[in-house]
Amino acid sequence: MFRINKLFYSPVKSLSFSSVKKLKILNNIGIKFDRNFAFTRDLDDNKINYILNNPLERQIINFLSLKHLPELNKYNFDFENNFLKLKKNNNIILCTNINNKLEVEILCKKIQKLVPKINRVKLIQDSINPFFDTMPSKTISLINLNSIRDFEIKLSQKVEFERFRGNIYI
């Protein structure tokens, strides 16, 4: 018998995970609000529109990610009631109404200040085709902690379980 110990989802693609008590699964989409948002990485408006309209063409390099910008690991996002909250050390440093263009622009400028080597940052949203660019289909991710513990033993060092996930296709 398997037991799920913790539930996480990521409102912003490749930047953070939020712990929640329950998740809603949407048929043919995945976890509600999971990776609905992404910050683009030095893309012009034409390229942004192209990847929004062609989900299979999305690549991790087009988005801000911890893989390429580990300095963002200090930050986290929560999404609730149309507000995207940027947090550092569990403290909200900016709360953005995603329906307010001015507030979204302020958030993008804040993110750009955190990663000055990136010239242009835009927040994009797609709730029908979330930003699952690393998988060919819509997925739900699970972590088997015993597998990670075995991996730690083989490596002889601690491994952050948040970096791994198994995938279930829906």
Label the predicted regions.
Residues 1-170:
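Electropositive, beta-rich accessory/interaction domains or terminal extensions
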